[in-house]
Design a protein with these regions (language model features):
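Non-catalytic accessory segments flanking enzyme active sites
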Residues: 4, 11-111, 133, 137-140, ...
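Cap/lid segment of the alpha/beta-hydrolase catalytic domain
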Residues: 79-199, 206-207, 212, 239-242
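Short beta-strand immediately N-terminal to the catalytic nucleophile in serine-hydrolase-like folds
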Residues: 203-205, 230, 276
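Short glycine-enriched nucleophile-adjacent loop
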Residues: 210-221
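Mobile cap/lid helix-loop segments that gate and shape the active-site cleft of serine hydrolases
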Residues: 225, 231-271
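Short beta-strand/loop motif that positions the catalytic acidic residue
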Residues: 269, 275-277, 281
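Conserved alpha/beta-hydrolase "acid-adjacent" motif
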Residues: 282-290
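C-terminal catalytic histidine-bearing segment of alpha/beta-hydrolase fold enzymes
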Residues: 290, 297-344
């Protein structure tokens, strides 16, 4: 055994092997503001492959040679300039029923409370049986938004995995209900902390996060000005077998997929919405977005975009990232609520 890794706000590795611990500690001193992960090595440790990343810096891969020389091999997104994009912190806030909800707050680098509250994106993760980590956001959405002047809250709402059994099981049967409360309570907390402008709140999510955005559209007391729903589930009754190829998971965990169904509540739609989905998406097929759009388009300003040749899961082609980021930015600037909102 060389060491062990604990899943906290990020993955934290502790080496019990003396040589590996020495190498790891040395690398952390060279890259003090980044996460350092050793990914491979040769016999004798004369060659050690490691990765660095932070909330502002995408994963970059390096080779430590003879323990005294570092050769940088490449970055996941080399076109991103080397400057700070995000001030990030792990937080906790109380839901309305008292449950403690973890979250990640990301702010434009250098923002101070004296600068005034920011337009804020509530950004629930997919899954919902998943979670977010601090450090580089692999989707690229968070640093993109903060670079445009938005604050971002990533609530680890009930149902999230990897943050304790109590939080995980509290989401059973609560789609669109208490799981949605956690998002709205996070928005309220951001406002109370002076970070969020209550008149410029947005929800943006993908996959389950897209469901949450659709649920916000029909939620009578939703605090958001608009919703961006990527690759959403919108009809729980028709979710069926599309969400997992694992039969045991469908039978066991499928029993927990219950709650408020957006498609059955479109008569209460009152939040403008952008829906987008890849035309090759088989996990959340495009009919979810299409059917929801047809039901709400005469009640609220609604836009539907089918992205050519895009599947559900990343990695996508470069053009898919460019197209969807332009779509999101344009919608926020021009169509979010009456007149749009702008981060900067």
């Amino acid at each position: 055994v060389l060491g062990f890794t604990v899943s906290g706000p990020t993955f934290e590795t502790t080496y019990v092997d003396g040589e590996m611990r020495s190498i790891h500690e040395g690398l952390k001193q060279v890259y003090p503001d980044q996460n350092v992960r050793i990914t491979d090595y040769n016999d004798g440790l004369s060659r050690v492959l490691f990765q660095t990343d932070s909330a502002s810096h995408p994963p970059t891969y390096h080779l430590l040679i003879d323990r005294n020389k570092v050769k940088t091999l490449g970055s996941q997104r080399p076109w991103i300039e080397d400057h700070e994009l995000v001030d990030e912190k792990w937080v906790y806030y109380a839901a309305r029923d008292g449950l403690e909800i973890p979250g990640i707050v990301s702010l434009p680098a250098g923002w101070k409370k004296s600068d005034g509250p920011l337009p804020t994106v509530i950004h629930p993760h997919g899954g919902p049986w998943a979670r977010d980590y601090t450090g580089w956001d692999f989707s690229g959405w968070v640093p993109f938004l903060t670079s445009r002047g938005y604050a971002v809250l990533q609530p680890q709402y009930r149902g999230s995995q990897g943050l304790g059994r109590k939080l995980w099981l509290a989401g059973d049967g609560e789609w669109g209900q208490s799981m949605q409360d956690d998002l709205d309570d996070g928005a309220k907390w951001m406002t109370e902390q002076g970070m969020a402008d209550p008149e410029r709140l947005v929800i943006f999510g993908y996959s389950y996060g897209g469901f949450a955005a659709a649920a916000a559209v029909v939620r009578p007391d939703s605090p958001v000005r608009c919703a961006i729903s990527g690759a959403p589930v919108t009809d729980l009754d028709r979710l069926g077998v599309t969400w997992s190829s694992n039969r045991t998971q469908r039978l066991m965990q499928g029993q927990t997929v219950k709650g408020k169904n957006p498609m059955e509540n479109t008569d209460t739609a009152h939040v403008p919405v952008l829906l987008y989905v890849g035309d090759r998406d088989v996990r959340t097929p495009s009919w979810h977005a299409k059917n929801f759009y047809k039901k709400v388009k005469d009640r609220v300003p609604a836009k539907l975009v089918l992205v050519d040749d895009m599947p559900h899961q990343m990695p996508w082609y470069y053009r898919h990232h460019v197209e969807t980021l332009k779509l999101i930015e344009g919608y926020l600037n021009n169509d979010c609520g009456p007149g749009g909102i702008r981060g900067s």
